Amino acid sequence: MPQIKGPAIFLAQFMGDTAPYNTLPNITAWVKSLGYVGVQIPSWDSRVIDIQKAAESKAYCDDLKGQTNGLAITELASHLQGQLVASHPAYDELFDGFAAPEVRGDAKARAEWAVQQMKYVIKASANLGLTVSPSFTGALLWPFMYPWPQRPAGIVEEGFKELAKRWTPILNYADEHNVDLAYELHPGEDTHDGASFDQFLEATGNHPRVAINYDPSHFVLQCMDYVGFIDLYGSKIKAFHVKDAEYRPSAKSGVYGAFLGWKDRPGRFRSLGDGQVDFGQVFSRMTAIGYKSWAVLEWECVYKDSVQGATEGAPFIAKHLIEVPTKAFDDFAGAGSDTERNRRVLGLS
């Protein structure tokens, strides 16, 4: 069995305009001091990467790797760009801020920009020697997630058909560069659980570059079997966000969460160890399926400060990493290989 790599950290939630959070050398020095050995870079944040330059220049990428204080670049995350590949008009204004200023207010131009950005991420990943980018699919169907009023016949199929149409050229480009797109199954995306992932995968013709960024927190908040999911979709899991969550329903609110803010919702993300995810089981199953990439902290918590969350995250992940065995635990009782002996034991000779 291969061994999971880590601990690594997704930098998005920690970026800022003052040191040590404002440049790649500064922030990697900080997270290295906390015990992290890898960083997942938010490809949309110009404070740590110029994604177009990274796509166009291998020399730039080589220089970028030299700015990380010896830490590995685990992946280039592309969630915000992926979100804009497909956006229902109801969310146009809310998502506009994810895009470059020159395409805001123009849904068609914004989607075209997002497609180009995804291609930059893919080429930059290849230039950095990376083989996966965690992302979002975006959403055309999310406003119709609850079946009331009754959905028009065929609307779900049409939605996934269009989603696949938009993503297939990007996936083909990813295939040319040996990069998987690991979609995070996340509320607000048309792919938010296993069943919706299956619908998208089928609509793409089972495209080989469609993969999953596994994040158990989103499944806790949907009351799903997040450990069983690993066994069911293990061959598709190519990235791993280590994020905790808790679901504490009340007599007033449950899974939908009314319109409450994060602090008051029954379902909320938590710092590692403060929620309900059984990470012992998660890391055991991830090891069992042969997951061999990175365990990356994604920190989100309404109660705890980000610095405390990052500080606690590295030892938490390190504690859960499993050193795979070099021999079977019962080798001491083995008798070696002997064909004739095996045949005698089977009563064949």
Tell what function each PLM region has:
Residues 2, 26-35, 53-75, 92, ...:
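Acidic (Asp/Glu)-rich catalytic clusters
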Residues 40-41, 73-78, 130-138, 179-184, ...:
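Short beta-strand segments at enzyme active-site cores
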Residues 306-329:
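C-terminal helical cap(s) of enzyme catalytic domains, especially alpha/beta-barrels
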Residues 40-65, 137-145:
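Glycine-rich, proline-tolerant flexible connector loops at the mouths of alpha/beta enzymes
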Residues 47-48, 82-84, 140-141, 187-191, ...:
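Short, small-residue-enriched loops and turns at beta-alpha junctions
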Residues 14-16, 296-306, 334:
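A short, acidic, flexible beta-alpha connecting loop/helix-capping segment that sits on the rim
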Residues 2-7, 12, 22, 38-39, ...:
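Acidic/histidine-rich catalytic cores of soluble enzymes
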Residues 21-26, 30, 85-211, 331, ...:
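Active-site acidic/histidine proton-transfer and metal-coordination neighborhood
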